[in-house]
């Protein structure tokens, strides 16, 4: 017994976690934010000021007669193009935000790639530091898009920066979380205030469980759905409101799910929740099967 205990102690000492000293501190957070925020405003600000000073100011603001604003062509064009210029500047701003964030994101991925596993918090860790930097870095770009006039550009932002992979035809409503390490297939709908968290802190000072969340094609999360790290939902799945999945849950798909933790819902409960008959539900299923068969035939041709 003593020999085995000594061997186990030696194995534990040999397999202990290697401590990694790092130099990255809060100045990287501030630097990334200021570069992304102010760097993305330079070109749009120049375009807007040039338009205002050279065209809008002399053609519209300096017009002495109020009647001339509606009777002459120049004041009319100046006022007409002003909203378009503002929209153009906003789109350029969003593109540059994504471009700078993508550049920073790729640097951090080269230093410490994102991967599934447990990130310790009780020792200095390069993985932990870059995880926090990436989490902070994506916050402003995400909110600048999803709370702006064109929230559907969030798909472009995620794919362009490389934080998430979003398929074609997928709609993402305003949500919390879900800004990194998420893979969503085609023609899916992510409902309002759905929370996809690819990380979970195990207690106040515990380790961080970090794992990719994967959703297949034609997946619907109605609203207020929470998915934990490592959740995998296969094709043709529909989640009822307030349904949630615990860590590393896997759903086979082709069904409706409800509750916490997620579980299948049968046709009687579906008709009860939706207020429809089973015949109407069967008709909807047949229409869906026909449309999916047509799409498969088109792709085959």
Could you tell me what each predicted segment is?
Residues 130-232, 236:
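Membrane-proximal soluble helical/coiled-coil segments
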Residues 2-3, 191-301:
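Glycine-rich hexapeptide-repeat left-handed beta-helix
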Residues 90-115, 163-180, 185-186, 192, ...:
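Solvent-exposed, charged interface segments at domain starts and junctions
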Residues 98, 113-118, 167, 216, ...:
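Glycine-centered flexibility motif
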Residues 1-156, 160, 268-301:
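Terminal amphipathic alpha-helical/low-complexity segments used for targeting or macromolecular assembly
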């Amino acid at each position: 017994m003593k020999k085995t205990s000594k061997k186990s102690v030696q194995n534990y000492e040999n397999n202990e976690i290697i401590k990694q000293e790092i130099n990255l501190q809060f100045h990287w957070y501030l630097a990334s934010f200021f570069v992304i925020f102010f760097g993305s405003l330079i070109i749009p600000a120049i375009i807007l000021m040039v338009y205002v000073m050279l065209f809008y100011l002399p053609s519209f603001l300096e017009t002495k007669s109020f009647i001339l604003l509606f009777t002459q062509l120049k004041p009319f064009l100046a006022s007409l193009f002003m909203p378009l210029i503002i929209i153009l500047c906003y789109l350029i701003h969003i593109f540059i935000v994504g471009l700078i964030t993508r550049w920073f994101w790729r640097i951090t991925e080269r230093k410490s790639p994102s991967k599934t596993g447990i990130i310790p918090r009780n020792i200095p860790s390069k993985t932990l530091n870059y995880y926090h930097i990436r989490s902070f870095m994506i916050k402003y770009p995400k909110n600048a898009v999803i709370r702006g006039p064109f929230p559907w550009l969030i798909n472009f932002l995620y794919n362009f920066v490389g934080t998430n992979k979003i398929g074609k035809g997928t709609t993402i409503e305003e949500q919390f979380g879900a800004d990194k390490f998420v893979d969503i297939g085609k023609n899916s709908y992510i409902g309002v205030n759905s929370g996809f968290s690819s990380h979970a802190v195990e207690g106040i000072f515990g380790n961080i469980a970090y794992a990719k969340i994967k959703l297949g094609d034609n997946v619907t999360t109605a609203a207020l759905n929470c998915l934990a790290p490592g959740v995998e939902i296969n094709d043709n799945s529909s989640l009822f409101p307030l349904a949630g999945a615990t860590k590393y849950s896997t759903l086979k798909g082709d069904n409706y799910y409800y509750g916490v933790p997620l579980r299948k819902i049968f046709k009687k409960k579906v008709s009860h929740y939706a207020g429809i008959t089973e015949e109407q539900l069967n008709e909807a299923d047949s229409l869906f099967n026909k449309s999916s068969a047509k799409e498969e035939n088109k792709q085959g041709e």
